[in-house]
């Protein structure tokens, strides 16, 4: 399997991927998640995708679209399964089988009732308190059986509960307190429910301390049977605590860990929202100087949460220089108390270890890829017999739709990789629709006019996406503007437009040059060319969609500029407006019932 359009070197990538269990996300050039998978051994599983033979048609189609792969390791395969399920629900990847809904994993539920029911539940969560999800129904049944043995909360349906005149078998085998016939007071039952809720929400240590006190009090009062019951409760709860593998429902928590090496840093953030929506992301902040890990985290937090929701608790791998000040700052900014901790316990301690491991692994991979980019620059110089290795590469690409909405992009790479802060887009005006030569000439003139003024850095190599004709436009501009010291190269698609068969046109040469499809120089050029194409296409689509959106609304009578703006602002975009009912549309200021019906009819004409 060969896809030279990856954002990474597959061999380098695989050599640094963890051998732990975990989850991987495959993304396209736009960052869209194409596929989410789990693995008992990430390296072993991912190596399968890079085999030259034996891949299914679906897998080959997937790998042709893959641009980047992100991994997150987990302590257990069960947790990888849960994380995979959460990510599939979140991103709805088109290469995954999207049949799983909330019925995929079971929860333990406490119903809303004067005498709540404790039971296993699978489906969309509505009324009640839900705890989970559990990795499989067997583990959930096992936990539920122990909880019923410990807390003796009723498992029966409400209809069964309200029609009892005597205790059922569950009471006889000491699995229920029989609240249906008054064998326990409402106050005592509520206290037991709270004990169960405390344990399921992670407050198990406090609960165990309380039960230990009850056991000692019963023993001191010579209530040995009662003391033995509480002792057994404590023992069973300890068993659950040790074997528990569910994602515990808790307050919103972010876990941040930093890893540093060779003057670089990776900050890994693990997000927990209500203990259910779990995802992970790696960030690589630029360091102006060597800083302690705590200082890196503190600087990162200030920027990271500037426009993001702040959770109630943040677990950190390192103490910050100003812990109290940062906590106060976040609390004021979010209007709720924010706790920072570097010494988590129980499940959060495991989350922190997992995040630290991912930070280290991602930093190693990041450093390896940077080294790989340097090697590719070196290979490029060797392939074209240049005496000096280039420092800066640029590539320009033109995109349009049947001659309309023409835009150009220019992407920049140095030996560390993409320099996205220097990327530029250009809207092309004043040319005949579809005239790519004129578009290329215009964008190169605009690009180098600024560079000659000192607004940016001159590239060493300038790639033009196109063949000999496009290269001639660039040569003409360079001669007109007296640009020197920049190597021009035209990148033409090869036979059948297949990646790896590209031809390279140089000024004043009558024949194109070629490179081996698997060479590092070829991979680098294709990577840069594809990135320029992606950047141009994304801008082109936005411009086209905006024009289509506005023109569609402009065709509706009595909808002027202010009403168009109000509609799009209220629903976010045209897609949101298309999904709205006439009643929803009337909620927009200035839109009457009659006008809402008119808008709805115009948008759905022909359906």
UniProtKB/Swiss-Prot annotation:
GO BP terms in the entry: nucleotide-excision repair; SOS response
Keyword terms: Cytoplasm, DNA damage, DNA excision, DNA repair, Excision nuclease, SOS response
Alphabetical list of PROSITE patterns matching this protein: GIY_YIG (PS50164), UVR (PS50151), UVRC (PS50165)
Domain GIY-YIG: 19-97
Function comment: The UvrABC repair system catalyzes the recognition and processing of DNA lesions. UvrC both incises the 5' and 3' sides of the lesion. The N-terminal half is responsible for the 3' incision and the C-terminal half is responsible for the 5' incision.
NCBIfam families with a match to the protein in the record: PRK00558.1-5, uvrC
One MF term in the entry's GO annotations: excinuclease ABC activity
Compartments where found: Cytoplasm
Start and end residues of each UVR domain: 205-240
GO CC annotation terms, alphabetical: cytoplasm; excinuclease repair complex
HAMAP family recorded: UvrC
Protein name: UvrABC system protein C
Subunit structure: Interacts with UvrB in an incision complex.
Chief location category: cytoplasm
InterPro entries, per database record: GIY-YIG_endonuc, GIY-YIG_endonuc_sf, GIY-YIG_UvrC_Cho, Hlx-hairpin-Hlx_DNA-bd_motif, RuvA_2-like, UVR_dom, UVR_dom_sf, UvrABC_protein_C
Keyword DNA repair set for record: yes
Similarity comment text for this entry: Belongs to the UvrC family.
SMART domains on file: GIYc, HhH1
Underlying gene: uvrC
Pfam families: GIY-YIG, HHH_5, UVR, UvrC_RNaseH, UvrC_RNaseH_dom
């Amino acid at each position: 399997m060969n896809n030279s359009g990856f954002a990474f070197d597959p061999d380098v990538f695989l050599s640094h991927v963890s051998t732990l269990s975990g989850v991987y996300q495959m993304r396209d050039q736009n960052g869209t998640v194409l596929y989410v998978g789990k693995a008992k051994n990430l390296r072993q599983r991912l190596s399968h995708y890079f085999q030259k033979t034996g891949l299914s048609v679906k897998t080959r189609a997937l790998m042709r679209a893959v641009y980047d792969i992100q991994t997150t390791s987990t302590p257990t395969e069960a947790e990888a399964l849960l994380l995979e399920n959460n990510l599939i629900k979140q991103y709805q990847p088109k290469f995954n089988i999207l049949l799983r809904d909330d019925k995929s994993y079971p929860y333990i539920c406490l119903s809303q009732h004067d005498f709540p029911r404790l039971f296993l539940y699978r489906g969309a969560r509505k009324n009640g308190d839900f705890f989970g999800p559990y990795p499989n129904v067997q583990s959930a049944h096992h936990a539920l059986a122990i909880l019923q043995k410990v807390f003796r909360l009723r498992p029966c349906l409400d209809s069964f509960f309200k029609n009892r005149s005597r205790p059922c078998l569950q009471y006889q085998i000491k699995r229920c307190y029989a609240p249906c016939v008054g064998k326990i007071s409402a106050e005592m039952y509520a206290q037991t429910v709270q004990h169960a809720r405390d344990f399921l929400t992670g407050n198990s240590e406090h609960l165990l301390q309380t039960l230990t006190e009850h056991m000692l009090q019963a023993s001191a009062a010579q209530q040995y049977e009662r003391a033995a019951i509480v002792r057994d409760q404590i023992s069973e709860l300890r068993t659950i605590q040790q074997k528990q593998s569910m994602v515990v429902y808790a307050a919103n928590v972010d876990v941040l860990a930093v890893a540093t090496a060779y003057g670089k840093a990776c900050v890994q953030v693990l997000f927990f929202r209500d203990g259910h929506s779990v995802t992970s992301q790696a960030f690589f902040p630029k360091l102006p100087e060597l800083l302690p890990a705590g200082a890196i985290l503190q600087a990162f937090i200030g920027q990271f949460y500037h426009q993001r929701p702040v959770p109630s608790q943040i677990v950190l791998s390192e103490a910050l220089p100003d812990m109290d000040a940062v906590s106060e700052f976040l609390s004021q900014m979010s209007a709720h108390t924010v706790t920072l901790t570097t010494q988590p316990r129980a499940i959060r301690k495991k989350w922190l270890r997992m995040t630290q491991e991912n930070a280290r692994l991602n930093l190693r991979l990041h450093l390896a890829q940077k080294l790989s980019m340097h090697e590719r620059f070196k290979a490029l110089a060797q392939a074209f017999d240049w005496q000096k290795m280039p420092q800066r590469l640029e590539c320009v690409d033109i995109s349009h739709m049947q001659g309309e909405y023409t835009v150009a992009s220019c992407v920049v790479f140095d030996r560390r990789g993409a320099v996205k802060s220097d990327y530029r887009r250009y809207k092309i005006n004043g040319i005949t629709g579809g005239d790519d030569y004129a578009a290329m000439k215009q964008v190169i003139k605009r690009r180098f006019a600024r560079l000659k003024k000192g607004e940016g850095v001159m590239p060493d190599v300038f790639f033009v996406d196109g063949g000999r004709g496009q290269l001639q436009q660039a040569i003409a501009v360079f001669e007109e503007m007296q640009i020197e010291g920049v190597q021009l190269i035209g990148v033409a698609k090869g036979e059948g437009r297949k990646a790896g068969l590209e031809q390279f046109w140089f000024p004043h040469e009558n024949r194109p040059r070629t490179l081996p499809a698997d060479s590092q120089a070829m991979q680098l050029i294709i990577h840069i060319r594809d990135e320029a194409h992606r950047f141009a296409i994304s801008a082109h689509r936005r411009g086209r969609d905006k024009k289509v959106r506005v023109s569609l609304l402009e065709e509706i009578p009595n909808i002027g500029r202010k009403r168009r703006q109000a509609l799009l602002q209220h629903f976010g975009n045209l897609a949101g407006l298309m999904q709205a009912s006439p009643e929803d549309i009337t909620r927009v200021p200035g839109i009457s019932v009659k006008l809402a019906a008119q808008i709805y009819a115009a948008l759905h004409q022909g359906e």
